[in-house]
Amino acid sequence: MGFVCLFGLVVMGAWGAWGGSQATEYVLRSVIAKEVGDILRVPCMRTPADDVSWRYEAPSVIDYARIDGIFLRYHCPGLDTFLWDRHAQRAYLVNPFLFAAGFLEDLSHSVFPADTQETTTRRALYKEIRDALGSRKQAVSHAPVRAGCVNFDYSRTRRCVGRRDLRPANTTSTWEPPVSSDDEASSQSKPLATQPPVLALSNAPPRRVSPTRGRRRHTRLRRN
């Protein structure tokens, strides 16, 4: 149960780490999961506040042949979704809304010749996942972000609370996730696939990139 406590501390730390309107981003790390019960004992996540964004830890290499289970926790407010690698004994939290959207897309297309039983099962699963997403409309927004905004993995309001300035900057200010050095995920050789993004330094619009010069294309019209 120790990993559950550590996981909870990492998650809960973001709620009290920063106050006011400062943009906050933090990483949701994987958990040790030797068996299914370890995943089921992880507490449900709360939907992030308006000024908080979540970024999910991605393994450096994903061997999909080793994914032994996909868990969509229906009772959680954000439909917490885990990918379980039993060989590595780890469970990875993924963006539930992106994952479910892709899953629904897969279910809507028949890969193999469908029979009556397969079609009925696939339709039932499609309906359940679609209803699960529909009941969580307040947990995620599909509004587009403004031009130049680099949105994080999960921002409830999709406000541009953090971004990389597309122009070269003289100074940078990085944010380190509030994770203790003795966290169970720190024992991994590559805990993060990418570096934490740089917080916004200004609200200036990004520079325009001129189109690449190339050869002109000539279109010939055929006359009948």
Swiss-Prot record:
S-S pairs: C44-C76, C149-C160
PROSITE patterns according to UniProt: GL_AHV (PS52024)
Region (Disordered): 168-224
One cellular-component annotation, GO: membrane
Domain gL alphaherpesvirus-type, chain residue ranges per copy: 23-201
Region (Interaction with gH): 20-161
Pfam families reported for this sequence: GlyL_C, Herpes_UL1
Predominant subcellular localization, coarse grouping: virion
Membrane-related topology note: Peripheral membrane protein
Segments of skewed composition (Basic residues): 213-224
Subcellular location(s) of the protein: Virion membrane; Host cell membrane; Host Golgi apparatus, Host trans-Golgi network
Cleavable signal peptide: 1-16
Transmembrane segments: none
Gene Ontology BP, a term: fusion of virus membrane with host plasma membrane
InterPro entries assigned: Herpes_gL_C, Herpes_gL_N, Herpes_gL_N_sf, HSV_GL_alphagamma
Keywords, in A-Z order: Disulfide bond, Fusion of virus membrane with host cell membrane, Fusion of virus membrane with host membrane, Glycoprotein, Host cell membrane, Host Golgi apparatus, Host membrane, Membrane, Signal, Viral envelope protein, Viral penetration into host cytoplasm, Virion, Virus entry into host cell
Functional description taken from the UniProt entry: The heterodimer glycoprotein H-glycoprotein L is required for the fusion of viral and plasma membranes leading to virus entry into the host cell. Acts as a functional inhibitor of gH and maintains gH in an inhibited form. Upon binding to host integrins, gL dissociates from gH leading to activation of the viral fusion glycoproteins gB and gH.
Subunit structure: Interacts with glycoprotein H (gH); this interaction is necessary for the correct processing and cell surface expression of gH. The heterodimer gH/gL seems to interact with gB trimers during fusion.
Sequence similarity: Belongs to the herpesviridae glycoprotein L (gL) family. Alphaherpesvirinae gL subfamily.
UniProt protein name: Envelope glycoprotein L
Organism: Human herpesvirus 2 (strain HG52) (HHV-2)
Taxonomic lineage of the native organism: Viruses, Duplodnaviria, Heunggongvirae, Peploviricota, Herviviricetes
